[in-house]
């Protein structure tokens, strides 16, 4: 399923709007705390393992959003937005939310 941050898809006509769809995922407390601890340990470098966890969280949120759109009969999602927020009592978890508008585009 096509998902794009733009409000339209060049060369395609939107034939039906189904409404807003979302997908969410949360990275657990220990992982999130360890993520920030690793940042302190890295000077001028990148932590590939934590980047991979964040990438997986983003991909999960996008997949859930697309699955919700498919259940409505959509074949694309436009206006996609990704948000990252800390949640929990001490802000020890990270929530990734994907949202957009489910649409049907001409084939």
UniProtKB/Swiss-Prot annotation:
Protein name: UPF0145 protein BVU_2335
Family designation: Belongs to the UPF0145 family.
Superkingdom of the organism of origin: Bacteria
Organism: Phocaeicola vulgatus (strain ATCC 8482 / DSM 1447 / JCM 5826 / CCUG 4940 / NBRC 14291 / NCTC 11154)
Upper taxonomic lineage: Bacteria, Pseudomonadati, Bacteroidota, Bacteroidia, Bacteroidales
InterPro entries in UniProt: UPF0145_dom_sf, UPF0145_YbjQ-like
PANTHER family from the UniProt entry: UPF0145 PROTEIN YBJQ
């Amino acid at each position: 399923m096509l998902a794009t941050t733009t409000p339209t898809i060049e060369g395609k006509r939107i034939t039906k709007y189904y409404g807003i769809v979302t997908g969410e995922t949360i990275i657990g407390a220990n992982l999130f705390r360890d993520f920030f601890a690793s940042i302190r340990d890295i000077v001028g470098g990148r932590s590939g393992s934590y980047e991979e966890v964040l990438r997986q969280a983003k991909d999960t949120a996008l997949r859930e959003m697309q699955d919700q759109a498919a259940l409505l009969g959509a074949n694309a999602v436009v206006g996609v937005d990704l948000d990252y927020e800390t949640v929990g009592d001490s802000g020890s978890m990270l929530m990734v939310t994907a949202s957009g508008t489910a649409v049907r585009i001409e084939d």
